[in-house]
């Protein structure tokens, strides 16, 4: 089976085209293993679509299928364009979270960056979902191991929960991340974003990704973090989101739509027996 390894700011993916009779969940676990496989945060599968130009399926490293992935969708768009599967620089992509619209910016025949319409943020507790009597779960006190944290949840394709911090301590994030992810508050689990506000136009983020763990970057996490930061008056609606490996631009428009922009790169191509 042929594959392509890609990444957006170190958030890496293996991209394959649909294969009949394959259990993609099992395949994701095998291929994403960083010791015995290719190594990646997730597996992206290219499939035909009846409602869009192309369909993207996303499987996390633990084999679970995700509804959407911001960085994954940007890698996916670059792949299908460069492979000639979709010839449009502005395309529609079917996902479990609905149809998204990546746009490729090409200079001298090379893709400079990819911008993707992430949809609109969902704040309604029951639709994130969060077990809460409040309509919105924003800046709410939650007690974990005897300590109280103020958490905010939003759905941007997938559930995200934001915690503002003054610094990034890896041991703290690795301990608290899975406790929030698997809390009974979140019936479907949640991604956890640790957010440090630098100024009104810049935030730094580290994401504990549901089914993955700490990642170098996360597109939907960048979007969720930017939206909540703006909602709470900490930043403007257009924000540079800084991850370990680089920066993503998130624009939360007045019409409630979110756009995510940044670079994506192909790492290598290869073949593997399955």
From Swiss-Prot:
Disulfide bonds: none annotated. Its main location: cytoplasm. The record marks 160, 209 as: Could be important to modulate the pK values of the two catalytic cysteine residues. It catalyses: (2S,6S)-2,6-diaminopimelate = meso-2,6-diaminopimelate. SUPFAM superfamilies: Diaminopimelate epimerase-like (SSF54506). GO terms for molecular function: diaminopimelate epimerase activity. Belongs to the diaminopimelate epimerase family. Homodimer. This is Diaminopimelate epimerase.
């Amino acid at each position: 089976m042929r594959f392509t390894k890609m990444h957006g700011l170190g958030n890496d993916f293996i991209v394959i085209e649909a294969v009949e009779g394959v259990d993609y969940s099992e395949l994701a676990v095998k291929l994403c293993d960083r010791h015995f496989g290719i190594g990646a945060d997730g597996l992206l599968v290219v499939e035909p679509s009846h409602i869009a130009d192309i369909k993207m399926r996303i499987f996390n490293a633990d084999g679970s299928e995700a509804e959407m992935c911001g960085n994954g969708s940007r890698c996916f768009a670059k792949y299908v364009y460069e492979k000639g599967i979709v010839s449009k620089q502005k395309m529609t992509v079917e996902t479990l979270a609905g149809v998204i619209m990546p746009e490729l910016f090409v200079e001298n025949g090379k893709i400079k960056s990819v911008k993707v319409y992430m949809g609109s943020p969902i704040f309604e507790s029951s639709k994130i979902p969060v077990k809460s009597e409040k309509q919105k779960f924003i800046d709410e006190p939650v007690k974990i191991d005897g300590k109280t944290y103020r958490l905010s949840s939003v759905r941007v394709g997938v559930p995200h929960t934001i915690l503002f911090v003054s610094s990034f301590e890896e041991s703290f994030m690795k301990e608290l991340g899975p406790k929030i992810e698997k809390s009974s508050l979140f019936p479907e689990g949640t991604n956890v974003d640790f957010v440090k506000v630098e100024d009104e136009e810049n935030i730094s983020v580290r994401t504990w990704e549901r089914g993955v763990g700490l990642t170098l970057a996360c597109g939907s996490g960048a979007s969720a973090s930017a939206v909540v930061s703006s909602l709470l008056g900490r930043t403007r609606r257009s924000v540079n989101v800084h991850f370990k490996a680089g920066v993503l631009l998130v624009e939360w428009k007045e019409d409630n739509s979110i756009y995510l922009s940044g670079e994506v790169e192909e790492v290598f191509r290869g073949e593997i027996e399955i």
